């Protein structure tokens, strides 16, 4: 079994890390993030690295400390590089456009879908069939991408809909006569 939690998360130069109780805060060039670690997990800042260890020898604590370490690593990646997801829109007449703080989506419905862009997330539309979502919080970037994809998920017959750029859509054959 992999024990990813045993490896400490190194804090690069230009990033300040603070640990207060169960709260880990990271501040870097892309902003500030914080994460509250579960009580079953012990978190310490030692020698410029954040170390995570299970507080108890229970299965729950063993499972949670690897997750906590991955979350702390995502904080470091978020404040240094940030995160980005790309969506593609496939279908005749399907397109996206930015209007101020809202994303307008024409997805084959009788009306356009308006999506209010949340704080801390930037959305770019390089082409009418491409959407780029960026931010420093991995969870929020993924959540926004999933919400936009949820308006018209790709269907298996023609592949029409909103899909992730690296997503493969399993295609089905239509019914035969």
UniProtKB/Swiss-Prot annotation:
It holds the Pfam family Ribosomal_L6. The keyword NAD does not apply. GO terms for molecular function: rRNA binding; structural constituent of ribosome. The keyword rRNA-binding applies. Keywords: Ribonucleoprotein, Ribosomal protein, RNA-binding, rRNA-binding. One of its GO terms (biological process) is cytoplasmic translation. InterPro entries: Ribosomal_uL6-like, Ribosomal_uL6-like_a/b-dom_sf, Ribosomal_uL6_a/b-dom, Ribosomal_uL6_bac-type, Ribosomal_uL6_CS. Signal peptide: none annotated. Part of the 50S ribosomal subunit. This protein binds to the 23S rRNA, and is important in its secondary structure. It is located near the subunit interface in the base of the L7/L12 stalk, and near the tRNA binding site of the peptidyltransferase center. This is Large ribosomal subunit protein uL6.
